[in-house]
UniProtKB/Swiss-Prot annotation:
Organism encoding this protein: Prochlorococcus marinus (strain NATL1A)
Known function: Allows the formation of correctly charged Asn-tRNA(Asn) or Gln-tRNA(Gln) through the transamidation of misacylated Asp-tRNA(Asn) or Glu-tRNA(Gln) in organisms which lack either or both of asparaginyl-tRNA or glutaminyl-tRNA synthetases. The reaction takes place in the presence of glutamine and ATP through an activated phospho-Asp-tRNA(Asn) or phospho-Glu-tRNA(Gln).
Name of the protein: Aspartyl/glutamyl-tRNA(Asn/Gln) amidotransferase subunit B
Known partners and oligomeric status: Heterotrimer of A, B and C subunits.
Keywords: ATP-binding, Ligase, Nucleotide-binding, Protein biosynthesis
SMART domains: GatB_Yqey
The UniProt record lists the keyword Transcription regulation: no
EC number: 6.3.5.-
Length: 491
């Protein structure tokens, strides 16, 4: 039956798989290095050979707990590992070690700033159901196709198998594709600030599965849930959600059934397509892993790890806005990467004004960083040197134009802006007598313009300012030059 007059509510939840940045895997000492030759980081435990026993990597537990704390989750004093049974070539044991009914952390939340196109930015609190630890699976490469269907054969690389994951499951609190993308971006931001993951989506360090349904707003029950996979950017998450919302609403309004299934996002075609029917938890036949003991986290350990947490992005954004007077936009851009925020704070601590520091860092410096594929940690131009340049602008030693002229060399080599200005003879002319002499010459050279100015064409002041800057190669102190010009031209 058509429901074209019905108002639809969208319900979205995200499962975010974060690869924890430990040097070795979750239950073995095998390396986690990315990009090496296939099947070079495997051992008997990874391969599930008989007689091998897993041992939990303590650093994995630390990273998982710190991640949970940053997401305001309650840390369980007691949790356990379970075996999740499924038969697929990327799991050599034919089961995955995960956590089912007793995860390491539950019931948290984060606040997300959402900038919807054409709408005012708003803050939304998103609940987080749980965080649990598990091992990653291997990677299948399908020859002749990007998926199993259509391929001639498949190859499996177990280098990724056994890499530690923290799976973060949100509550179904998201209502738009934009909210889903912003939530995923904030989770990644937090993980990177903590240093527990690099969050590289292209390398699979952070992967998101979207669970999405629609329902008439007059009804309470959720609609049929569809899972979407294969999104490797925040833009893809948003677009996949938006496509799937339209697809499901169209199906319901046409009287069609929406199946509970897993679908893949096709970036090329910009649509989702059916992959397989979705299993329920009972299909995985979970049971406690007999080879791994219970996980216990003492209060002392919790307090120690909590004391090591850095200031997180949301707290920084708030501080930059309330204490430093920055706009919400500037605070958001500066805190997107921890290295940029650290650089900014060092500049301010060295005496750079917050607003001008933000403008230069998010503008010229960020453009240089992006075009050269660097991070602020790798920049030759030190925070103290940028602060020195900003103070020179503020005191009138150089103009903004001269600062931009010397910036390319400072960015590529670093060094003292003051010394560079002296070497190039670019310092501002601040001596009134020198400026007066130049202005007197200009007045003699342009008598007609002087007469027109005195007759009321005050816009000609800009002409004389331009001529003065041309004569001084932009080095005349603008404020002083305007004062003297006004006085001289008035006669």
């Amino acid at each position: 039956m058509s429901e074209s007059n019905v108002s639809w509510e969208v319900v979205i939840g995200l499962e975010t798989h974060v690869q924890l940045g430990t040097k070795s895997k979750i239950f073995t000492s095998a390396s986690t290095t990315f990009g090496d030759d296939p099947n070079t980081h495997i051992d008997p435990v990874v391969c599930g050979l008989p007689g091998t026993l897993p041992v939990l990597n303590k650093k994995v537990l630390e990273y998982a707990v710190k991640a949970a704390m940053a997401l305001n989750l309650n840390i369980a004093s007691h949790s356990k590992f379970d075996r999740k049974q499924y038969f697929y070539p990327d799991l050599p044991k034919n089961y995955q070690i995960s956590q089912f009914d007793e995860p390491i952390a539950e019931d948290g939340w984060i606040e997300v700033e959402v900038a919807e196109k054409g709408k005012e930015t708003y803050v939304k609190k998103i609940g987080i159901e749980r965080l649990h630890m598990e091992e990653d699976a291997g990677k299948l490469v399908h020859a002749g196709s990007d998926q199993l269907s259509g391929s001639t054969h498949s190859l499996v690389d177990y280098n990724r198998a056994g890499v530690a994951l923290a799976e973060i499951v949100s509550k179904p609190d998201l209502r738009t594709g934009r909210e889903a993308a912003e939530y995923a971006a904030e989770v990644r931001r937090i993980m990177r600030y903590l240093g527990v993951s690099d969050g590289n989506m292209q390398e699979g360090s952070l992967r998101c599965d979207v669970n999405i349904s629609v329902r008439p707003t007059i009804n309470d029950p959720f609609g049929t849930k569809v899972e979407i996979k294969n999104m490797n950017s925040f833009s893809a998450i948003q677009k996949a959600c938006e496509y799937e919302i339209k697809r499901q609403i169209k199906a319901y309004e046409s009287g069609e059934e929406v199946k509970q299934e897993t679908r893949l996002w096709d970036e090329g075609k910009q649509l989702t397509k059916s992959m397989r029917s979705k299993e329920g938890s009972s299909d995985y036949r979970y049971f406690p892993d007999p080879d791994l003991g219970p996980i216990e986290v003492s209060n002392e350990l919790k307090e120690k790890w909590r004391s090591e947490l850095p200031e997180l992005p949301a707290a920084k954004r708030n501080r930059y806005s309330t204490e430093l007077g920055l706009s919400i936009y500037d605070a958001r851009v500066l805190t997107d990467e921890s290295s940029m925020a650290t650089y900014f704070e060092k500049v301010v601590n060295e005496g750079g004004a917050a607003k001008s520091s933000a403008n230069w860092i998010t503008g010229d410096l960020a453009a240089y960083i992006n075009s050269n594929r660097l991070t602020f940690d790798q920049l030759h131009f030190q925070p103290s040197e940028l602060a020195e340049m900003l103070k020179m602008i503020d005191t009138g030693e150089i103009s903004g134009k001269i600062a931009k002229e010397i910036l390319p060399e400072l960015l590529s080599k670093g060094g003292s802006p003051k010394q560079l200005v002296q070497e190039r003879g670019l310092g501002m002319i601040g001596d009134p007598k020198v400026i007066e002499e130049i202005i007197d010459q200009l007045i003699l050279k342009h008598p007609n313009e002087v007469e027109s100015f005195r007759s009321g064409k005050k816009k000609l002041l800009g002409f004389f300012v331009g001529q003065l800057m041309k004569e001084t190669k932009g080095k005349a102190d603008p404020k002083l030059a305007n004062q003297i010009l006004n006085k001289k031209l008035q006669g």
